[in-house]
Structures are given as C-alpha cells and as structure tokens.
Amino acid sequence: MPGEVTLAHEVGKDFMPVTGGSQVAYVLVEARPTEMMAQVRMPLNFVLVLDHSGSMKGAKLKNVKEAVKMVIDRLEPTDYVSVVIFDDTSQVIIPSMPANDKPGMKAAIDQIRDAGGTTMSLGMIQGLNELRRWHIPNAVNRMILLTDGVTYGDSDRCRQLARDAASAGIAIYPLGIGADWDEDLLDTVGQLSGGMPAEFIRNATDALSIFEQQLQSAVDVAIRNTTLILRLPVGVSAKKAVKVLPIISDLGQSVLSDRQVVIPLGDLEKDKPQSVLVELMIDPRPAGLFRIAQTELSYDVPIANLEGEKIRDDVKVTFTTDANQSAAVNANVMNFAEKANAHRLVTRVLEEYKRTGKATTRLAPNVTRVLDEETQAALEQINQGQQISQEQVKSIGNKTRKLTQRLDDVVP
C-alpha cells in the first residue's frame, strides 16, 4: 500500500546554462518513513558480542557491563537477546531467549571477568549462531560487536563472517572502546554486513549512551531491505555516489553502471532519513526542461507483510540561456557536497598518515572551515610532520563521517 515511505530529491541547480560542453549536476535523494510508521515496533533478535580480554580490565569492562544491563532492562518480552563474550576463546553466557528473566540475565552479566587475548572471529561465530537459533517473524536481526583491541590473526575470517551475516539478513554494528582497536577492520565488518562503520567510545563512561543509541536505532527500524535505483537517460552518466545521511560513506564504483546507479540502503528508521548524493555528468542540451534521472525506491514493510513495494520520482532540470537563472544554486545540496568532499579529503589524510606517518594532502580553507577545532588542530600537526595519538585518529574519522548531521552552517 502507498504512503509508508517518502522519496524526495533536490538538485544542485534547478536551472543549468546552455553550453557547448558537458556539465556536472548534483542530485540529493532522500528516503524517509512517514508518520504512518511512527508507532511501528518490530521485535528484536539481538546479540551482544563483547570483548572481555585482559585489556578490558577496570573502567572499560565495568561501564560496558552497566550498559548491557541497561539494554536488557529496556527490551520488550517479544524481543530475543543473547550475550557472547570472547577473549582468545568464546563463551555464550546468555543463550538466545525472550527477554523475560531480566534479573537472571543481569546476574549473568555481573559475572563477566577480564581474561585472555583477543580473537574476535570466535565471538562473531557464536553470536551468529545465537541469532540463527530462532525464526522470529519480522524481527530486526542485529549484532552489537564490541572490542578494545586488535584481533589476532583472524581479520580475513572476520570479514568473511560479515559477508555471511549480510547473506542471512543480519547487520553488525561494531563498537570500539579506547584507542587500540583496528578501525579499518571494524569499519569494514560493519559495512560488509549491511550495518554501520564502527562507533568510537572514546571514554569508558560514554558506553551507556552509545549502547542506548544502538538499542534505539534497532527499535526504530520500520522499513527493511530498502534499495535506491537511479535510472539515467542517454547523455547522462553517474560519476560518483556518496551516502550523506545518517553518516557520510563513499559508495565506490560498484554501485555505478552505464545507465543506472543501484544503492542498497538496508533498514530505514523512523524519523531518520537516509540520503544519497549522486554526481552526474550531463551532455550538452538545448534550452528546455529535461529529465536527468528517474529514482526508484523498493522496500519491504514487514509489519504489514508487504515485500517489494516501489515508489518513483522524476528528476528534472531546466536548461536556460538566462545567466541570472543559471547562477542560482541550492545551498542545502551544495552543503552536503562540501561536507562529503571534506570527508573524502580528511579520510585521505588519515590513510596517508596511518600508512607512512605523514601526509602530503593539504586541505584548503573551504574544507577546514566545516571541521571542528580539535580536528583542525590535529590535521595541522600532521601537516607539520608531527605525530598524533591513535585516539585522535579515531576521533577525527568518527566525527568527520558525521559532518552532515549538523547542517546549521548552510550558506543561503
């Protein structure tokens, strides 16, 4: 039935100049559940996979245990939950079950002690097994994966397990606590599974709020298996696609082909848009109104037993010889483009720094102006050949991918 999701777009310029050459056009596409879905609450099939190695000793483990108990308290009886711990072995301390015996579950959490090394794949295997134990109709299947260290010799196995999770409809949401975890691996695990890049828990005391956000994200899921397609007419090609909300993520070349762009969006959460910025190249056109793309969103509404629902929208621009008309730009779209570019360049600086201990990429003032003072100062240190901490590296990456969550600096 219609009305569960809105599909909207904005273009960088509604009026483009008639020229003799090809031109770049930005299209910002947004998908969002409607108010019709505001009261939807699908059951959760949740596993928390927790590193309890020796390096978790003290405040980190203490705060994580309190955060896990908070999650248990907030689950509904229709939710299933399990908890797996790992060091260089793994153990299921709460097998997957309905969230009924909360005192018993929390007592089991209190018994977790720090010990051993870090072999993350063992925890992931047990976690996936727990999620597969039950067939729960319409459930949101999700793994929260927390670690504070570098896994030992099993990174490729972790990546393959993330692919296996995606095939089973299980999204992994990694959390890194402290400064010593492998952000490249955790980001990849999250993205390969259809989840998110790693969230950085900078201070142990932040664990409670981060776990609360993760739980709320799962509770808010209303639409599943969402895919955005842009179909392009002759004379229009796609150069780049970047997810810009809820975070910035370069989608790479795999989503692009000659005549269409196919972008898996996964779950849509209530009141939270997912937005994609697509850069198109348009061949010369005479004056007039032209369609430069057709957008299509396919999605499932599990609560209504609907699969493969579709909505479409035409993206049009006017080519004009009026210089005043073609000079106008959409500030909102260009703000997203500016921040996506800032994320790309900062990511390049961090990659260079992690690889060589220095960076040759320099950021222009129009890039640095959208960054906070801490990030600017750390990047300046890198440019001057100085070292920054692993904590700063993780903080910069985490904050830069969230630049678009703050759009109050739009220039009209």
Question: Can you say where each PLM-predicted feature lies in the sequence?
Answer:
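Exposed acidic/Ser/Thr-rich ligand/metal-binding surfaces
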Residues: 2, 7-225, 286-287, 369-372
